[in-house]
From Swiss-Prot:
Organism of this sequence: Staphylococcus aureus (strain MRSA252)
Name the UniProt record assigns to this protein: 2,3-bisphosphoglycerate-independent phosphoglycerate mutase
Keyword Lipid metabolism appears in the UniProt entry: no
Lineage: Bacteria, Bacillati, Bacillota, Bacilli, Bacillales
Chain positions recorded as Mn(2+) 1 binding sites: 397, 401, 456
Cofactor: Mn(2+)
Length: 505
C-alpha cells in the first residue's frame, strides 16, 4: 500500500506584499496557489532579521532560510554571533585573537588585518575591524596594518570613502592603525580561481609591485576618475604606510563568509599553493573569523556550531523515508543547508538533482527547470514509498534577481502550473503539503520609480497547510515549519528543536 507523503514545498523568493507595483507575486496569474490559499488554512511568517538569527532589519536569504527551516529553531548566523560576542565582551577574551596578538608582541612584529570594509553584513562588517583595533590597543600592539577590500556590491557602488573616513577617525581616536593597501573585492575576493586577479591584491598587500598613492582616499578617488566603482578598484599601496607581510607577523582576516575569503587565504596559509609563484612568509600566525576551507592552515576565531536534530535527522531516527529535490541553483539549500551544514545523506534519504538551464541570465528562460523538477517528483511519488518530501522551486528568486517584471511574472506562472500537478497528486495519495517560501524577492522587482530592484525583501512569507479542519497561529517564523511538518507526520518534536508547530492545538 502506498504511503501518505507529507511535503514541504518552498517557493524560493516569494513573499506577501500589499502593493501591486513591481509585485510579480500579485500580478502573476496563479490559479493553483489561489485555489489552495482559499480552500485551506493559511498564515504568514517572518523570514528576516532577528526571526532567522540575523541582525534586526536584515533581509533573509536562501542559505539562512533553509538552515532555519531545517533546524526548526532560530539559527544564529555568524554576523549575529560575532556582534553578540563584541557586545558581551567575550570577543576580547577570545583565545585565538589573543594568541595572534601574543605572537606579534613576542616577535616585536606587525599585526595585519584583512577584510571587506563595509557594513553590507553579507561577508563582513567593518565594526568588527574596529573591535580588533580596540583589542590591539588594549594589548599594546604598536604596528597595525589594515588591508582594506572595497565592496560596492552589497552596499552602494561608490560608498568606500565613507568607510575609509570612519576607519581613519577610529585610527586617530585609538592612536594605532593605518591603511597599508586597498583592493577592490573583484581582485582580493575572487572565488573562481582567477589567480591573476588575486595576484594583484597579493602584491599590494606584500608591498611588492603595485600603484602607490599618498592616502587611501587619494587612491580611491583616482579610480573613480577612471570610471571604476569600489568593487573594481585596482589594488594599490598607501605610500610609507605599508611594510608588507613579513616573517613573524600575524594576520587576522575578519570576513565571516568563507567563499570569497578562501583564495587569498590559501596564498598565505596553504604550503601547497600553486596558483602563482609566491614567497612563503615564515612563522606567520594566520587567523580567520570562520573556517574557510580544509586547505588553509589557520586558527579559527569562531568555530562552527553543530546543529543536531534537524528535520532530516529526526526523519531518520523515526525510520521515515525522505526525498530532497531541486534544480542545481537550489540543490545545496534542500540538502546541505536544510541538514544544518551536513553533506551526507541520512538513512532513508534520497535526492534528485535536476540541472538548471545553461543560459546567461534566467530572465531568458523564466521557467528554468521547473517542469523537469515536477516530472521527476511525480515519478518519485508514483513509487509510493515516501514519507517526507522537501522540494524547492528556484524560479521566483533566481528570475526575481534580474529586476525584470515580465520574466518574473512568467517564472511564477510556470511554478504555479507545476505546483498544481504536484499538490493534487499528494492530495490524491491522502498526503499533506505545506506551501511556503524562504524569503522575499519576486514580491518587489521594481523600485517605486520603476528601477530594477534585484535584492531580497524583508516581507513575511505565506504558509498554506493543506489539511482541513485545523487552525493556524497568526504569526510565526521559518523555524516553526519543521515542527509543523512533525505535527503532520505525528512524530514527537525533540527538545533542541525549539520552534513551535503553526497548527493550534
Amino acid at each position: 500500500m502506498a504511503k501518505k507523503p507529507t511535503a514541504l514545498i518552498i517557493l524560493d523568493g516569494f513573499a506577501n506584499r500589499e502593493s501591486e507595483h513591481g509585485n510579480a507575486v500579485k500580478l502573476a496569474n496563479k490559479p493553483n496557489f489561489d485555489r489552495y490559499y482559499n480552500k485551506y488554512p493559511t498564515t504568514q511568517i517572518e523570514a528576516s532579521g532577528l526571526d532567522v538569527g540575523l541582525p534586526e532589519g536584515q533581509m533573509g536569504n536562501s542559505e539562512v532560510g533553509h538552515m532555519n527551516i531545517g533546524a526548526g529553531r532560530i539559527v544564529y548566523q555568524s554576523l549575529t554571533r560575532i556582534n553578540k560576542s563584541i557586545e558581551d565582551g567575550d570577543f576580547f577574551e577570545n583565545d585565538v585573537l589573543n594568541n595572534a596578538i601574543a605572537h606579534v608582541n613576542s616577535h616585536d612584529s606587525a599585526l595585519h588585518i584583512f577584510g571587506l570594509l563595509s557594513d553590507g553584513g553579507v561577508h563582513s562588517h567593518y565594526k568588527h575591524l574596529f573591535a580588533l583595533l580596540e583589542l590591539a590597543k588594549k594589548q599594546g600592539v604598536e604596528k597595525v596594518y589594515v588591508h582594506a577590500f572595497l565592496d560596492g556590491r552589497d552596499v552602494d557602488q561608490k560608498s568606500a570613502l565613507k568607510y575609509i573616513e570612519e576607519t581613519e577617525a577610529k585610527f586617530n581616536e585609538l592612536g594605532i592603525g593605518q591603511f597599508a593597501s586597498v583592493s577592490g573585492r573583484y581582485y582580493a575576493m575572487d572565488r573562481d580561481k582567477r589567480w591573476e586577479r588575486e595576484e594583484k591584491a597579493y602584491n599590494a598587500i606584500r608591498n611588492f609591485d603595485a600603484p602607490t598613492y599618498a592616502t587611501a582616499k587619494e587612491g580611491v578617488e583616482a579610480s573613480y576618475n577612471e570610471g571604476l566603482t569600489d568593487e573594481f578598484v585596482v589594488p594599490f599601496i598607501v605610500e610609507d604606510q605599508n611594510d608588507g607581510v613579513n616573517d613573524g607577523d600575524a594576520v587576522i582576516f575578519y570576513n565571516f563568509r568563507p567563499d570569497r575569503a578562501a583564495q587569498l587565504s590559501e596564498i598565505f596559509a596553504n604550503r601547497a599553493f600553486e596558483g602563482f609563484k609566491v614567497e612563503q612568509v615564515k612563522d606567520l600566525f594566520y587567523a580567520t573569523f570562520t573556517k574557510y576551507n580544509d586547505n588553509i592552515d589557520a586558527a579559527i576565531v569562531f568555530e562552527k556550531v553543530d546543529l543536531n536534530n534537524t528535520i532530516g535527522e529526526i526523519a531518520q531516527n523515526n525510520n521515515l523515508t525522505q526525498l530532497r529535490i531541486a534544480e542545481t541553483e537550489k540543490y545545496p539549500h534542500v540538502t546541505y543547508f536544510m541538514s544544518g551544514g551536513r553533506n551526507e545523506e541520512f538513512k532513508g534519504e534520497r535526492r534528485r538533482l535536476i540541472d538548471s538551464p545553461k543560459v546567461a541570465t534566467y530572465d531568458l528562460k523564466p521557467e528554468m527547470s521547473a517542469y523537469e523538477v515536477k516530472d521527476a517528483l511525480l515519478e518519485e511519488l508514483n513509487k509510493g514509498d515516501l514519507d517526507l518530501i522537501i522540494l524547492n522551486f528556484a524560479n521566483p528568486d533566481m528570475v526575481g534577481h534580474s529586476g525584470m517584471l515580465e520574466p518574473t511574472i512568467k517564472a511564477i506562472e510556470a511554478v504555479d502550473e507545476c505546483l498544481g500537478e504536484v499538490v493534487d497528486k499528494i492530495l490524491d495519495m491522502d498526503g499533506y503539503a505545506i506551501i511556503t517560501a524562504d524569503h522575499g524577492n519576486s514580491d518587489q522587482v521594481l523600485t517605486d520609480d520603476d528601477q530594477p530592484m534585484t535584492t531580497h525583501t524583508t516581507n513575511p512569507v505565506p504558509v498554506i497547510v493543506t489539511k482541513e479542519g485545523v487552525t493556524l497561529r497568526e504569526t510565526g517564523r521559518l523555524g516553526d515549519l519543521a515542527p509543523t511538518l512533525l505535527d503532520l507526520l505525528n512524530v514527537e518534536q525533540p527538545e533542541d528543536m525549539t520552534g513551535e508547530s503553526l497548527i493550534k492545538h
